[in-house]
Amino acid sequence: MNLAEQSWMAVRDALAGGARVAAILPCGATEAHGPHLPLNTDVIISEGMARRAAALLADEGLHAWVLPSLAYAPAEYAAAFAGTVSVSVASAKALILDIARALKAQGFACLALANSHFDPANVSMLRAAADEIRALGLPV
């Protein structure tokens, strides 16, 4: 189920209903993937991963909502290619931490990061962000 397609009242009611609700954040990038693939290849893959994970959890009677995707990330390896939009590690990490804080404040039980962008700077950033999110008291 996609969070962005819900009303705020539906989200409130789900979180207040006593069930533990997980959030899944698709993490991709806008970067070159050769001459044959779109710039949002990582976003497409991470969204598919997140939807599949939410469906598998639903099959087990668990509730998970897919958040709107992150389409910008550190993309240093592809930065020289036209169309690639690389953001700093600090900016990307700050955004993910802000999202996690908001989810925790609203009562989400945990956050899963569905990443398909494996630039080393991005992977390191996600690991560091996950450590900080756990320190906030939100399981990742």
Specify the residue positions occupied by each region the protein language model found.
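Short catalytic helix/loop segments, enriched in acidic residues and glycine
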Residues: 42-55
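Extended amphipathic ligand-handling, pore-lining, and cofactor/metal-binding catalytic surfaces
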Residues: 35-36, 40, 61-62, 79-82, ...
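Short coil-to-beta-strand
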Residues: 17-27, 62-74
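Structural signal for hydrophobic packing residues in well-ordered secondary-structure cores
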Residues: 54-57, 134
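Active-site and ligand/interface coordination hotspots across diverse enzymes
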Residues: 1-38
